[in-house]
Amino acid sequence: MDVDRLQEALKDFEKRGKKDVSPELDQFLCHVAKTGETVVQWPQFKEYFLFKLEKVMDDFRTSAPEQRGPPNPNVEYIPFDEMKQRILKIVASFNGTPFTIQRLCELLTDPRRNYTGTDKFLRGVEKNIMVVSCVYPSSEKNTSPSLNRMNGVMFPSNSQSYTDRSNVNGPGTPRPTNRPKFTLSSPMNTNGLPDSMENKESDLQQKEKSLSDSAVFDDGSQATTPKNKHSAEDSVEAEEHEVKRLKFDTEEDEEAACANPDASSEVSTEMAEEAECASTSADKGKESCQTAQTADEESLMTASESTEVECNERDSETVSVSEESSEESHQMEESEQSESACSLNSEEPNSAAAAASTAGTDSSEGNIGIKSTEILSLSPMENSEEATNAPEEPMEQD
């Protein structure tokens, strides 16, 4: 559409008194009806639009008289002249191009396309002019930086230049905000659906099962080492308990022998037997310690070292006890010899008892290993003092 020719046609229309139809301006209205683009501003073609609208309404009434019969009770009846003046007044109040300009131009160029009655045609026109939004011509987008609108009316001002926006809801419609795209955090299957909860539960069960198996294996490996330790400690404690019991028994027997010197021979034999049993048990204890040591060398070094130390201490105790018992037996032998000498001078039965006691002491000398206490070491010393004091009495009798 040539803008220069259009402006010349508008000037000619004004010169002719705004009463004649211009083919060029009718062609302009057809162009707007097809494309919706207004090449010129609204004030320039507003007068011709009003002239064309009034002419079409008059022609429509002459060609199609008003409807006969009673009017529609659901619609307010308005006379033609009143409706015509109302429509022309609303259009004349526009200071900007209404955004329904394309539909209005269609009604002006081809009024009988959709309507046959005058009343319906007027209501269709009224519906399209009851708007407030405006549109801008294509030329105004680039050449008119000082336009403003308020309630569908354009006012010249120092506003910013027009920016391209959609005319569906009219100019000035706020633009939609750009919403961020959210991605699914859950994994997707091949068909595009997220994984089901059953798969997640099965994975969790497998993980828990593997963790429990590893924990049981660790507990079993840790439980084997304390078992070996406890078994070795139990054997050592049993041996120590047995040795203490034998030691306590020997102490009681020796005390009884001191009280009854006639039964010393029997006690000495019993002590010898118990000493042999103790020695055999000690040997067995050593062997068990050695076997436990060889079995637990790799896994339990601490347990084997403790058993070795205890065995060495036990050996040293047995050696010290044997030395003490040898000294005590030597002292007892001397005291018994002195007693035998005194008894020979006094009475023969006493010499026989002394000989029996010396025989018992000789047998006790061969069996070393009896454990004694400090009480036994004190009793022979008292006997020796009595023996030294006994020979003095026969000398006085002589």
From Swiss-Prot:
It comes from Xenopus laevis. Signal peptide: none annotated. One of its GO terms (cellular component) is protein phosphatase 4 complex. Residues 139-149, 156-170, 183-193, 278-294 have a biased composition (Polar residues). Transmembrane segments: none annotated. This is Serine/threonine-protein phosphatase 4 regulatory subunit 2-B. It comes from the Eukaryota. One of its GO terms (molecular function) is protein phosphatase regulator activity. InterPro entries: PPP4R2. Residues 197-211 have a biased composition (Basic and acidic residues). Residues 138-398 are annotated as: Disordered. Residues 338-366 have a biased composition (Low complexity). Serine/threonine-protein phosphatase 4 (PP4) occurs in different assemblies of the catalytic and one or more regulatory subunits. Belongs to the PPP4R2 family. Regulatory subunit of serine/threonine-protein phosphatase 4 (PP4).
